[in-house]
Amino acid sequence: KKFIVILFFLSFFSYAQKEYSLNKISSDKIKLDGVVNKSEWADAIQIPLIYEQEPGKNIKAERNTIAYLTYSDEFLFVAFVSFTDPDTEVRASIRPRDNMSIWNDDMFIIRFDTFKDARNNFVFSSNSLGSQFDLRMLNATDDRGKYDSSFNANFISNGSIAEDRYQVEWKIPFSEIPSPNGENQQWNFNLGNRYYKDGKTIELGSQAYDRDNPCEVCQTTDILNISNIKVKKRFELLPYVSASVSGERENIDDKISYDPIERRVGLGINMDFNKTTSLEVTFNPDFSQVEADVTRIDINSAVSLRYRERRPYFSRGTDIVRFSDGAFYSRSISNPSISTKLLSQNSNSRIFFLTAVDQDSPYLVASEDKSYLGQGGQSFVNVFRYQRIINDKARIGMYTSNRYYEGGGYGNLVGIDGLLILNKKWRLNYELFKNFNQEPTKDWIDSSDKIGDRSVMLDGQEFNGDAIYLTFERNTEHWKSYFTYRNISPDYQTDVGFVVKNNRRWGTLRHTYQNIVDKENLRSYEFGTKLDVNYTFDNNLKTISLDGDFQIETIGNTEISYTYDWDIFKNFMGIDFKDLPTSDLNIRSSPTEFFNFNISYEWGKDLAYNEEVPEKGKLKTFSIYASFQINENLNINGLLNYSELKQLETSEYYFSGNIFRLTTRYQFSNFLNLRLIAEKNTFNKSFFIQPLVQWNPNPSTIFYLGGNQNTDLEIDEEIIPLLKFRRSQIFFKFQYLIGLKK
């Protein structure tokens, strides 16, 4: 026994790779019923998850968790069993695929670095009821840039909860895991178990985790050997049919008059040339969103707001075109009639090539303080991206995008970028772009404003600009620091991107201390400061801003954070303002599976940006989100956002209003749900409800039937009853994945 204990503790001081060679079985040996049967998994290797990575620092795991791995010609089989006491609460509910609420559950995780160069990790996870979440983890140090949930793999998962354990079984086709060509594979991998206990989130792993190394994907280093596999090339057809009917009533007492039914059919094709290169083609795609975007308050924004991409075609593979700059924004391609996308990643390179004919082209013009958005006509778009993987510590790339407008005008952008990991603590990111533009001669934007000597109105002018982004980062277990420099010229524009401000030379310095202490009432704490200084290209001071912030994690999985943002000086629309402080308090908590919430409150001084003459005002905003998991099937959540800005000397408002959104979802299974969304917006005096039935058995096959019912709360000074809908739409779509593997 003493010898075993000594060996165990010695393992914590050795971060050496462990190597596993899997045993091969027949595909029909394992019955994927969610119960890990010892006889079925007898040939699998067993890997214990012995490290508690958080909150403990690579200490012995309290909960006994074992993973099982084996494979057949075409599939990788993975199982997890986590042993518990009979009175242990296991968090698990039936969730739709890739729904963020799943991270309130206890989760099993496997990560693959199939190219063994830390370019990314392919992550598969599920809870003990088989609900799935897969993603691509990137080589970044902040959570915003680290996770790409657009990665989707078609795999099978089933799980169950017993008196003394919870468990899950997965069957993953090799064709769904991006990897090098060849029948013999060697990958890096590791395993995880994330669960809740006594008001804390606990993370276990099969490897020790180095908190001094901020590169999480670099720490997936255990070796997995698999031989003589068969990876069939995918040839997939994705036909769809959809229909909708819309109507509107002219007056309150009229019946809704419906237009003729609109019908659409289209086809998608996905084919593999080999294991590393694929082509997608879509004809007459239906990219209507199944779920409405959460409405954001924009009444005091001088620039356009950016929304997350929800269309699977445009989100797949786009991690390679993520830039600090906003050089690529897939939602700038709004209504394509045809599009193609080539994806390729080899042992030392990656390629992304997208083309599209867009029928409705948004046209975004950035300036020093404001942005201008117009709706254009047809355009031809292509985007090309190449990245060279030098090794696990260096990569360089180039990027180009082109947009040619029907009737004249274009926007071309070229650039280079790179990542250099100088050592475990230091890294450098850089992006350099140059644009060449000729405006269309169109009436898409109605404005008499000027940007230097150039009019905002589209009158065929030619211009070009450039942008530079540099970031130095230093990260250790306790200290995180970065310096960012942004140099964006007055005529910089990205026609297939999203840049809303230019004419700035902007430096940011950030320094943070953090510590995981794992005490009864204090799990961790963090505090930091940030300085921003911004000049124009004419060397005029735009902004001096100083922030201070702290964050603690305490009982009940609760995080409390506070930020004091002091704009010492700000110039907006040529007017100088001084002393604009704001405070921001946030509380986020997940005390139980039944209930979690997020509260934020911001107060202080801000500008009324959209007044004819900008002025200071007293700001007050708050947001409350609450989610109730009634049982493993039913979830109800609500979100209330309120914002107001008052004049300093009087009680009059520049603006005041709120948006309330209520979502009810009943999840019959992992694939079938019924959802009802209702939203009331007092800013634009509207109310809508959106009922929807959705069946989604894999990432591509989908059926939904739903509607949109809209009410204008105030028209011609007449108040319409809340459920007296002015506009109505009913729609359905059926899209089915037909796999014709070669």
Segments predicted by a language model, with ranges:
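Short leucine-rich amphipathic alpha-helices used at interfaces
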Residues: 110, 148, 154-155, 242-243, ...
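Sec-dependent N-terminal signal peptides
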Residues: 2-12
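Catalytic-domain carbohydrate-binding cleft regions of carbohydrate-active enzymes
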Residues: 170, 188, 258-259, 278, ...
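Structural preference for beta-rich elements and adjacent junctions enriched in aromatics
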Residues: 16-387, 397, 408
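Residues in well-ordered beta-strands of folded domains
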Residues: 23, 70, 111, 125-127, ...
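A short local loop/turn or secondary-structure capping micro-motif enriched for an aromatic residue
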Residues: 40-42, 85-89, 132, 143, ...
